[in-house]
Each structure stands twice: as C-alpha cells, then as structure tokens.
Amino acid sequence: MESKIYKMELAGRELSFEIGKYALLANGAVLARYGDTAVLVTACASEKPREGINFFPLTVDYEERLYSVGKIPGGFIKREGKPSEKAILSARLIDRPIRPLFPKDFYHDVSVIATVLSVDPDNPPDVLAMLGSSVALSISDIPFEGPTGSVLVGYVDGKIVINPTAKEREVSKLHLVVSGTKDKVMMIEAGAQEIPEDIMLEAIMTAQEEIKKIVEFIEGIVKEVGKPKMQYEKRVVPEEIKQKVRELAYEKAYQYVQIPDKIERDKKLDELKEEVLKAFEGETEDTLLLVDDALYNLEKEIVRKMIAEEGKRPDGRKFDEIRPLYAEVGILPRTHGSALFKRGYTQVLTVATLGTKGEMQFLDGLEEEEAKRYMHHYNFPPYSTGESKPVRGPGRREIGHGALAERALEPVIPSEDEFPYTIRLVSEVLTSNGSTSQASVCGSTLALMDAGVPIKAPVAGISIGLITKEDGSFITLTDIQGIEDFFGDMDFKVAGTREGITAIQLDIKIHGLTKEIIEKALYQAREARLKILDFMQTVIDKPRSELSPYAPKIFKTTVDPEKIRDIIGPGGKMINKIIAKTNVKIDIEPDGRIFVAAPDDISGNRAISMIEGIGREIEVGQFFLGKVTRTASYGAFVEIYPGKEGLVHISQLDNKKLKSVDEVVKVGDLVLVKVIGIDRLGRIALSRKEALNVTYSRKAK
C-alpha cells in the first residue's frame, strides 16, 4: 500500500496520520503526530476466535519509550521495564472508549499497542494515542463500529480550552479527557477543582463538537484506505436452547433477582444456573457455553425489564435512593487515621499515614521529574467478592480506581506550607457490591479528618447507572449495586464537595451517551453527593485538632540558602551530628526551607534551634552561653552554636592575669561569652572577661 499522510488542524495545531509506511504486517497501523509528539499505534487480531470464552479478549498496551524525551533509563539494565502507573492509566484511557464498539459476538484476540516515539510537552501523547487507536482500528479489517475522537479540555481564566498547552495545563482548574463518536460521548475522565455541574456539562459538550470534526476527518481516511471488514464466525444461541432455558429458568430467575439480600440472591441464582446446566448434562462444552450465554441474556432481560417497565430495582429501592450508609472513624489505634465506610454490602477500610518530606514519591517518566506528597492506593483482594484465588500485585483496575480516588481528593489536600507532611491513603475493599471506588473516596475523606489533616472540604463520591429503552428513553439509577452494574448500560462515577465536582470517570457498554443522559446523571449525582456529605459530617464534622501521638511531628524553618553548606558540614558531618543528638529526620530544600521530623516536641525544637544557630549571622557585641570544647595554652575554644566555635584568648578569660587556662575553665564547662571580633576568614574572637558582669537573662534578650 502506498504511504499517505492526512492532515487537519486541531486547536490551532496540525494533527496528522501517516498510513502505509510503518508496521506493514499489522491489521491496521498509523503514525500519529501532533506538534512534535509522535505515537505509533498498531491493531492486530488473531485469525481464529479463542475457544471456551464468553468475553471479548481485548488487550491495550501503552509503551513509553524514554528516548522520546531524550532520556536513558536508570538502573543497571538500562532499558524500559514494566509499565509505569502513568502508562497503565493511559492504556485504560485508550481501552475504555473502543471496547463497547466491537461486536458482542466477536471473540478473536485483539491487541492494540501504542508506542510513544517523541514527546512535545504541549501535546500529551496519551490523547494522541487514543486518536491513533481509533484510526488503526477503523482502517483495519477488524470489526469495529467506530471511529472515535478524543480531546483534552482545560478551564483557564474562566474559559474552556481544547487541548491546552503545558503552561495552560499548569493553571487550568480542569483536566478533562472526552472520547466519543460523531454524535455521542463514549468516555469521560476528569479531575477538577470543584467545578460546578453546568460548567462541566458545557466543557463535555464543547469537547463533543471538536470530536465530531475529528470523527468526520477519520471517516474520510477510512473511505480512502480502509480495508473490508473480516468475516468471522458468529456465536449465535439457537432458538431451541433459548426456549428451553426460558422454560426452565424464567419464573425462578424473575423471583430470585428481586431478593433484596445480595448473599441470598447470588446463592439462589447460582443454584438456578446449576439446575439449568444439569438439564443439558452430556452436551458438548460449546453447547454449555451457549446455555450460559442464554441464561445470562435471560437474567439481563428480566432485570432491565423489571426496572424499565415495572419501575422496580432488584433490592426494592427507588431510582434515586442511596443504599443504607454506615461509617466509623478511629478504628485502628496505632495508625495515624482510619475509617470504615459502608454503603449497602460495599465496605471499604481506608487508612491514612503521615510521613516526612523525604518519603515523597519521585516519578521520573516521560514528563519532568515530579515529587508526589499525596498518594492513594486501592486494594481489591479476592475475599471482597467471596472468591478463593492467589493474591497478586495491583492490577490495572486497582491502579485505575486508586488514581480516581486520588484525583477526587487532590483539590482539598492542604498545601505543603499549611501541612508539611507526605500523605498516603490506602483503601482496602473488604466487601464488594458495586461502587467500591466511590466508597473509597468517602472513606478517604473520613480517614484524613481522623488523622487531623486540615482538608479544605469533605469529598464524597457516587455512581450513577443507566437503563436505556428501545424507544430511546432512559432511566438513571443512583448508587448502583453489582447486579445493576453488571446488566446496566453505564457506570458514571462522580466525586466532589458541596461546591462542585473534583473527579469523574465514565464507563459505558452501549454506543454512547446523549447530552440529556449526561446532564441528568451529573445533577442526580450532585443530589446524592450532598446527602452522603450530610451523613459523613454526622460521623466527624471537621478534622481533628491534634495529630495521632504515633504520627511524626514536623517542624519547619527557613535559612539563607548560602548557609545550607554550613548546616550540612563537610561530608555531612554537621547535619549527622544534629540527627544523632536529637533523633530526628531532616530534609533540606535548595531555597533554604528545612523540614525536621521528630518523635516529640522537645527533640524537634532542639533540632530547629541547632539548625537556626548554624544559619544565624554572628555579630560583634552578642552574648552566648557556650560550651568549652577544648583548651590550649593560649586560650579556650567555646562552641556558641552547633558548628560555631570561637576562641577566648587567655587574656580574655578573666579580669586577673592567668598562668593557665585551667585556672578558670575546663572542657565541658558552660560559660557566658561576648563576641568581640570576627576576622575576614570568619574566625570568631570571644571574651569571658567582658561577660562576667552580664546575667544569662540579659543575654537572652
């Protein structure tokens, strides 16, 4: 195929797709460029479907290459290793809008790989990779009902900005990624500084207008170079199996899905499944898979009809009703802050830990090195769903949910000047029945307040579900539980304060959302969020006034940056001496800010005093109470501050003439001295004689 380049203007910059030159054996491949950012995206599919599965086997990988920013990987191996957290989140961004657009009966393995080749800070590669994935799939022979378009949206100086530059992103109150088809929204991912619902909706719809132009542009490319879509073997459930499953299961399934208690409901539905499969005993594995499909479709039909036509939810709640709430704080005595948050069966334990500045997380990826002083980690162990399987490291879903909760709380975390601690939150999902990520947002707020972190406002989260009808009408459901998420059309997670939204994550299973659905979901989420915040503030209404006795105490001082060298001392001698004497941790910033983490107030204040002493300017005429460190025939050396010594000449030790220094002082004595001179080399001359008639209280003044 002849190489072709297609170009369009997007937000004042050139967007281009080069096709037919790279990765020639892939089903679809494109080199996407935006400014100086370049990403190669490929799409490949297996020739045959994977056997024995009832899910779509799509994998998306986002490969960061450090050469794209002119860096060589650190460490001994000097090559890229496992994907970073940012790479995993970017892969999820690519995956979520395209997954619903594959045929439901397509079971071939599909692999989408985005390789970042060059990065321009003004043009983030993740959004470009999303566009590249849409092009690669659309021009390939893989069945795909796209194309999609994607943009980044900012809110700068009261204006909505499409694809903001690096400088604009620094001051933007909104970081919103929207993906969609020509007329509907497929995916939303947002972090915001308490943005009101009306502005958020305007930003989403402004993005949709740009997405429409992108999709029309990609459609033109597909008309020119797109391959015919492959024919594939469709797995269709025969009518006789459908009918038999319906006869065996309909009445019981209708009865069981309405059992309010999740444990009892799941038990009965599992028993029904066993009963149905037993009726097909002796059939092939392929037939049993079709039976499983038929039973799934039957249960889905019942739940959706029950909600849409009868106005009933499985647990009997109203459409806008939240499950029963329960919360408790301070449940773990030795942690710095802890909270248990429960919504229905969903139960999350969140623990807050306060650390020193030196415990921040340093990120060295495609962007400039960044230090994170606030982190949120989310764990989803197998027991939370009653399963027995090995515990592995965090998966993509756990990393994604942790990032969502982190983003939700970030706008209310106090600045380093207000609260000089590193903050780590860990949410342990103890029981899962829908909306665990939003429960972790609520639990995190409570744990921070229990830890005494002066957050700017409490944050709560809620998930809104959706049931669409054949006539185009729809029903939105507040606080969806597992069965509603499983059989519903969307999971629209919204977190925020009373003032506005701080985070959004939208996942859907249908071919997009209209403005009406998004607007209804945003305002329904706000109504629920305010109710949850009211409840949370009955548990703890404001951050505790004191930190846990087990949390480190952090003290802060500022010195002249030129004095940092003296505070550290040759080979770290001086700072290590302070640490050894006071049992503290010390972090020094290049601008002269110094943070001291101590086990108690006495140690912290002592360390600060020693540091300030070293950084202090000594002036002639000042008095100090110092310790004699050594003596010589010509005088005594007195340490007036850690690292600051002066000489009291023998003639300045006493009013009378002395034969020996030892007549008046010896090593270890505390003596009051006066500064009588400082030479050009910084050597300090002291006098005990001139301080003999001065009291210590006068010196303190």
UniProtKB/Swiss-Prot annotation:
PROSITE patterns: KH_TYPE_1 (PS50084), S1 (PS50126). Residues 552-611 form the KH domain. It catalyses: RNA(n+1) + phosphate = RNA(n) + a ribonucleoside 5'-diphosphate. Mg(2+) binds at residues 485, 491. This is Polyribonucleotide nucleotidyltransferase. PANTHER family: POLYRIBONUCLEOTIDE NUCLEOTIDYLTRANSFERASE (PTHR11252), POLYRIBONUCLEOTIDE NUCLEOTIDYLTRANSFERASE 1, MITOCHONDRIAL (PTHR11252:SF0). Keywords: Cytoplasm, Magnesium, Metal-binding, Nucleotidyltransferase, RNA-binding, Transferase. Its cofactor is Mg(2+). Pfam families: KH_1, PNPase, RNase_PH, RNase_PH_C, S1. It is found in: Cytoplasm. Transmembrane segments: none annotated. Belongs to the polyribonucleotide nucleotidyltransferase family. One of its GO terms (biological process) is mRNA catabolic process. Involved in mRNA degradation. Catalyzes the phosphorolysis of single-stranded polyribonucleotides processively in the 3'- to 5'-direction. Its EC number is 2.7.7.8. GO terms for molecular function: 3'-5'-RNA exonuclease activity; magnesium ion binding; polyribonucleotide nucleotidyltransferase activity; RNA binding. Residues 621-689 form the S1 motif domain. One of its GO terms (cellular component) is cytosol.
